[in-house]
UniProtKB/Swiss-Prot annotation:
EC number: 6.3.2.8
UniProt entry keywords in alphabetical sequence: ATP-binding, Cell cycle, Cell division, Cell shape, Cell wall biogenesis/degradation, Cytoplasm, Ligase, Nucleotide-binding, Peptidoglycan synthesis
Family: Belongs to the MurCDEF family.
Cell cycle recorded as keyword: yes
Name of protein: UDP-N-acetylmuramate--L-alanine ligase
Catalytic activity of the protein: UDP-N-acetyl-alpha-D-muramate + L-alanine + ATP = UDP-N-acetyl-alpha-D-muramoyl-L-alanine + ADP + phosphate + H(+)
Protein's job: Cell wall formation.
Positions that bind ATP: 118-124
Pathway, per record: Cell wall biogenesis; peptidoglycan biosynthesis
Organism field: Cereibacter sphaeroides (strain ATCC 17029 / ATH 2.4.9) (Rhodobacter sphaeroides)
């Protein structure tokens, strides 16, 4: 048995179906670091799978029954459905089939754990908590939902007692995770295809918080009405609140922005009057990012970190991939790639962009899933108000069938009907390039938003602009 886990040390190859997924790859990487043999498949190779191969994993491009080889256990995510050839082969052989969250929970069993949940902000907050614990000398194990720039990966295996994980509420699996400290950033109606109703999602978050042990801690953002209501329902667990509001235990005050950097103080109201961390800075704009940082500060203080350590760690924060990531600057125009695909996220990112530049903000969005656009259509029509120009690409279907009234052109029409002065459709990367050449001027910012292929467009855009300009 491995000292860091209860998994048998002699366990044969662990096969991941969909190993290139951001949630699966982090678990695979930590297992390899612990000495286990890992293999897996995905539809195509990627930077993630290339990294895993460089660490010793065996990768199969495409999914077929023969890929299992001598696998002793098969790990699947909620995206893997009945009929997948590798899943069917595993069941035919009688192999254990383990959900991603179940394997993650196994890795967490021998440690104290910090689990970060919320409809938005999980990945950035997870990265911030990891950054602070690194600075505090805790040497945590980390499994995140995005690539942490300081690691060059979404995971690392540390030697310390603590483990920091992003807790995914999309399929309810976060309630399987044995959290010691549970963070809740916000709660919005999302992933209704799993939960069925907002009340069921609320219950899921309630269970997430109340599942912590009696000696644990819940860290909750009471700027969000749903989270404040959750706090009011929890009566038998210790809770520390954070936010901008005057009642928060860990509160941001004196916030200002300068050249895209947030400067603020943190009032530690739960520690008594006069306890303040002064002179905090965070090298990324956005009130939502400051809020995420407050959650990390609350955890760091709970674990005994000093004010100077916290201040220095956040000032050097390197960020996380696809969370307001600058991918280039051409002719004075800054190009940003961001994962935001929910109206709340889009509005927050565009507000951050407005705080970061003196010029105009040009938003380019690829809606993710017809079902999301359909269920939140009015919110999508009003979340782009901070953008001077909005361009909407074709919906990234993610396997869904089109829904009447929930397409690209419908959203453009909806934006115009709701009063946006400059909304238009784009068809392809060439259209995006033409748009930027036509609209962008020095000092402007182009923000590409979405969870699909829009990231590739954003990353290609600087070279396209420079190549055509040469």
């Amino acid at each position: 048995m491995n000292a860091a886990t209860k998994l048998p040390g002699e366990l044969g190859p662990i096969h991941f179906v969909g190993i290139g997924g951001i949630g699966m790859s982090g678990i695979a990487e930590v297992l390899m670091t612990l000495g286990y043999r890992v293999q897996g498949s995905d539809a195509k190779a990627s930077k993630i799978t290339e990294r895993l191969v460089s660490l010793g994993a065996t990768f199969f491009e495409g999914q077929r029954a023969g890929n299992l080889g001598e696998a002793a256990v098969v790990v699947i995510s909620s995206a893997i459905k009945k009929g997948n050839p590798e899943l069917e082969e595993a069941r035919l052989r009688g192999l254990p089939v383990v959900r991603r969250a179940e394997m993650l929970a196994e890795l967490m069993r021998m440690r104290s754990n910090i689990a970060i949940a919320g409809t938005h902000g999980k990945t950035t907050t997870t990265t911030m908590v990891a950054t602070l614990l690194d600075k505090g000398g805790f040497d945590p194990t980390v499994i995140n939902g995005g690539v942490i720039h300081a690691y060059g990966s979404n995971a690392r295996a540390g030697a310390g007692e603590w483990m920091v994980v992003e807790a995914d509420e999309s399929d309810g699996s976060f309630n399987r995770l044995p959290a010691t400290i549970a963070i809740v950033t916000n709660i919005d109606p999302e992933h209704m295809e799993h939960w069925g109703s907002f009340d069921a999602l609320r219950k899921g978050f309630y269970d997430f918080v109340t599942n912590i042990p009696f000696y644990g801690l819940a860290v909750c953002c009471t700027d969000h009405a749903e989270v404040q209501a959750l706090v009011g329902r929890v009566t038998d667990r210790r809770i520390v609140t954070f936010g901008f509001n005057a009642q928060a235990d860990v509160r941001a005050i004196n916030l200002r922005y300068e050249n895209g950097i947030a400067h603020f103080d943190v009032a530690l109201q739960s520690e008594g009057a006069g306890h303040v961390i002064e002179g905090m800075s965070l090298p990324m704009p956005g009130d939502h990012n400051v809020s995420n940082a407050l959650a990390a500060v609350a955890v760091a203080r709970h674990l005994g970190m000093k004010k100077d350590e916290i201040r220095e760690a956040l000032a050097a924060f390197g960020g996380v991939n696809r969370r307001f990531t600058k991918v280039g600057e051409v002719g004075g125009v800054t190009i940003i790639d961001d994962y935001g695909h929910h109206p709340v996220e889009i509005a927050a990112v565009l507000k951050a962009a407005r705080q970061a530049v003196k010029g105009r903000v040009i938003a380019v969005h690829q809606p993710h899933r017809y079902s999301r656009l359909h269920s939140l259509f009015d919110d999508f029509c009003t979340c782009f108000n901070e953008a001077d120009v909005v361009a909407i690409a074709e919906v990234y279907a993610a396997g869904e069938d089109p829904i009447p009234g929930a397409g690209r052109d419908d959203l453009v029409a909806g934006l115009i009907a709701h009063g946006h002065r400059h909304a238009r459709a784009i068809l392809c990367e060439d259209d995006l390039e033409r748009l930027v050449r036509e609209q962008a001027r020095p000092g402007d910012m182009v923000v590409c938003l979405g969870a699909g292929t829009i990231s590739a467009w954003a990353n290609n855009l600087p070279a396209r602009l420079m190549g055509k300009a040469a």
